Design a protein with these regions (language model features):
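Oxidative protein folding and maturation machinery
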Residues: 1-72
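Short loop/turn microsegments at loop-to-beta-strand junctions
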Residues: 59-60, 82, 161-163
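Extended hydrophobic-aromatic, low-complexity segments
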Residues: 74, 84, 92-97, 112, ...
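Thiol-/selenol-based redox modules, centered on thioredoxin-like
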Residues: 166-185
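Structural microenvironment flanking redox-active thiols in thiol-disulfide oxidoreductases
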Residues: 96-135, 148-153
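Short, internal strand/loop/helix patches
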Residues: 131-165, 169
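Short active-site neighborhood of thiol/selenol oxidoreductases, capturing the structured segment around
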Residues: 70-102, 117-121
Length: 185
């Protein structure tokens, strides 16, 4: 049962992906005396990932280097709303989604009015890739390279790239793992 729930409600390529619906399955499996050790361990592992940066919780802070080599952190970004994008410039799907975001008129209007800021974080750590691609993003976006070890320290559940979060002014997660249609609403 857990494998089916995970396949349909957790995997990034599932059209039914919904971590909130997955939570009861994970909690039950993690606590079930009837489940074998593997199922309980798998449920615990996934539960830990799903509970990270859930809607309603404060997003984990991290440090990054900007295009102009300034050290910043997530919580210092002042914005009514912040679209946080974890991406890899060598990921074709990432660049397709970023291109869609750049072309979306509602997002552009909110960005230009100052209601929304976009922080795009390169998480992979390859300095030459970062230097070669950091200026491909629009100038009115904040582009950064992770220096906190987001992936290694599992600060965020980055099960697929790109991963998009929408945060409020207090850095509380409004939406997690959203698609472009959700941003425009």
């Amino acid at each position: 049962m857990l494998e089916l729930a995970t396949k349909y409600l957790y995997e990034a390529d599932s059209p039914m992906e919904n971590e909130e619906m997955l939570l009861p399955y994970l909690q039950y499996a993690a606590d079930s005396a009837r489940a074998d050790d593997y199922i309980r361990m798998r449920a615990d592992f996934l539960l830990e990932r799903v509970l990270k940066n859930r809607p309603g919780t404060k997003a984990a802070d991290f440090q990054y280097i900007t295009r102009d080599n300034k050290k910043r952190n997530l919580w210092s970004v002042q914005a009514e709303e912040l679209l946080l994008i974890f991406y890899d410039p060598e990921c074709q799907h990432c660049m397709e989604i970023i291109s869609q975001i750049m072309r979306d008129s509602d997002i552009s209007d909110r960005l230009n009015s100052g209601k929304l800021k976009i922080l795009a974080i390169y998480t992979e750590g390859n300095e030459s890739v970062w230097k070669a691609n950091k200026n491909q993003l629009p100038a009115n976006w904040i582009a950064g390279k992770d220096i906190s070890g987001i992936v290694d320290n599992e600060l965020y559940d980055l099960k697929a790239m790109p991963m998009l979060y929408l945060l409020d002014k207090d850095k509380r997660v409004l939406m997690k793992d959203l698609d472009i249609q959700n941003i425009s609403q």
